[in-house]
Amino acid sequence: MTKYLKFIVFTSFMIGFIETSYADFGFIQDKDGYVNVRENPSLSSKVTTKLNNNEIVSCVMDEETNNFCLVNASNGVTGFVYRNRINNFSGYTSIKLSQYSREKAVYNDKNIIVEVYAKKAISDPKLYKTFKDEYKYFNDKKFFGTDGSLPDNNFLQLDKIIVKEKDNRMEISRIELEQYFFPKDGVDGGRNELADFKIYYLNNNIYILNTFNNGGAAAYNIVLNVKNGKVVANKAWKVEI
């Protein structure tokens, strides 16, 4: 009975936490080189693991206490981290959306242009493989965004990303991006999640981030890091609540 009551209290707390919060991206930054991840949003709560500096995380911030955020990291770690241990790309320049259509979004400022392209999702079952009765692999790559089912006509998949910087142009190809699926329409028929990228740059270091299927069972984060014209990181992970 006691365990049951604890579960009810924790579940109620988490629902309230999500309802009064917002999500953002950042990276771990601590003078000790790592940060403690806690079971609950309290400095007295049990430490469950650690995250090293520069690990990219998504952060759901509690607007009421504004002291902790619920992090999801690319290495699978989920838990609470004290907010001042996360750098939300301070010192980086953020570029904003300037053009949008269902299958193309453009972000730019005076120094850089990032074009993100999508296309109608391929649904040919011959290109997919299952694991434990769920579709898990597309063209032999683990894919994201459909919660184990085949994508239908309501889905798009990333096609390519072009980065233009002064006289330089580089492309993140379809082969590197085709495993990322998302709904073609936004909430109430509005803009889809091509319009929701967070893009930051500092010198020749560019981060391209998004949360696809945000709020749904198939929600996942994607982080692309382009450094000196080359993709040095391409990570995606399921959002765990």
Each model region followed by its residue ranges:
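Bacterial N-terminal signal peptides that target proteins for export
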Residues: 1-9
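Bacterial N-terminal signal peptides
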Residues: 8-16
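Sec/Tat signal peptide C-region and signal peptidase I cleavage site
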Residues: 17-23
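SH3/SH3-like beta-barrel superfamily modules
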Residues: 24-27, 50-84
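Short alpha-helix capping/helix-loop boundary micro-motifs
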Residues: 41-46
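Surface-exposed beta-loop interaction hotspot
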Residues: 83-149
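Acidic, glycine-rich flexible loop segments
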Residues: 178-222, 227
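Short, low-complexity, Pro/Ser/Thr/Gly-rich segments in the mature regions of secreted, periplasmic
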Residues: 225-241
